Regions:
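Short regulatory helix/loop adjacent to the ATP-binding pocket of P-loop NTPases
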Residues: 1-10, 23-29
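Acidic/polar active-site rim loop that often engages polyanionic ligands
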Residues: 2-6, 16, 38-39, 62-66
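Short, flexible helix/strand-to-coil boundary loops that buttress conserved ligand/catalytic motifs
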Residues: 8, 22-25, 49, 163-167
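Hydrophobic/aromatic beta-strand patches that form the interior of the parallel beta-sheet core
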Residues: 9-12, 153
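Amphipathic alpha-helical "lid/sensor" segments that cap RecA-like P-loop NTPase cores
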Residues: 26-64, 71
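Accessory nucleic acid-recognition modules appended to NTPase machines
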Residues: 51-172
Length: 172
């Protein structure tokens, strides 16, 4: 966010598209696709040579930077449940997500009471940090939008979180 005489502009930069990534990659397109598929489109990934370096960079960026900042900024006390929610979202990319059902699942499986409003807030925190993006249904109208489940997609691919290649392709 830039600030000029009381006016602010927010610039939301998305990760590189595959076209941008492959242009900067410089090698054959198959190798570029493998790297993009496994490590995503963050520009700094291109400067890392070894798979271990790429994984370490992505993991530290996500866990040590993004999650730490979100947890501290929003004073999240249920850190374990917050991390589990991220795992749930990652494993259900492209599926409808209902915070009330997730709340009931935490109660029945983990014997933890987490209100659906809290789960909704946690997801909003991830959206505000540009980690996930929400896709609402286009086939419903009017009041049906209220309380309607949505799908969530990760802004970039984090290799630590990809449960299956099928879900990863859905996320692309």
């Amino acid at each position: 966010v830039t600030d000029f005489r009381g006016r602010g502009d927010e610039i939301h930069m998305l990760p590189l598209s595959f076209s941008e990534f492959s242009s900067a990659y410089g090698s054959n397109i198959s190798d570029a696709w493998d790297d993009y598929f496994n490590y995503g489109g963050l520009p700094l990934v291109l400067s890392k040579q070894l798979p271990e370096e790429k994984e370490e960079y992505l993991l530290s960026l996500f866990k040590e930077l993004y999650l730490t900042v979100i947890i501290e900024r929003h004073n999240i006390r249920n850190v374990e449940e917050f991390n589990e929610l991220i795992d749930i979202l990652a494993s259900s990319v492209g599926s409808l997500t209902n915070p009330l059902k997730l709340s009931k699942t935490f109660k029945s499986v983990k014997n933890k009471t987490i209100r659906d409003a809290t789960i909704t807030k946690y997801i909003e925190y991830l959206q505000d940090a540009f980690i996930v993006d929400k896709a609402v249904r286009f086939d419903i109208k009017g009041k049906k939008y209220i309380g309607s489940p949505a799908k969530y997609y990760f802004e970039d691919i984090v290799s630590e979180m990809k449960p299956t290649d099928v879900l990863l392709l859905e996320n692309l």
